């Protein structure tokens, strides 16, 4: 199976059930405004291609300060990122998310939410692949 195509100006990942999908899942949770950035896609994809897990990538994002590590702020930020909203989740949902973070850790929380495929265009990815540089 062909997983990657290379052109003179860009590359296309066709492995929509593996690393390309994880790349978009990860970016969608951490920084959805960067989902269209081909350089960011390429960098993240290369880390997944090197064998990094979603949880390792999530921990890296936390270590680099790419996303807050305060439990309440993390819960609210991820909610806003995934659902593309400026509104905070209601207090009950915030409390449930914070409880998950406290019990499982912030990297596990990010990895779990990323795996939900909420903020990923699966149809577009399957039809045309994921462009990156």
Task: Say what each PLM segment does.
Residues 4-133:
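Substrate/cofactor-recognition hotspot
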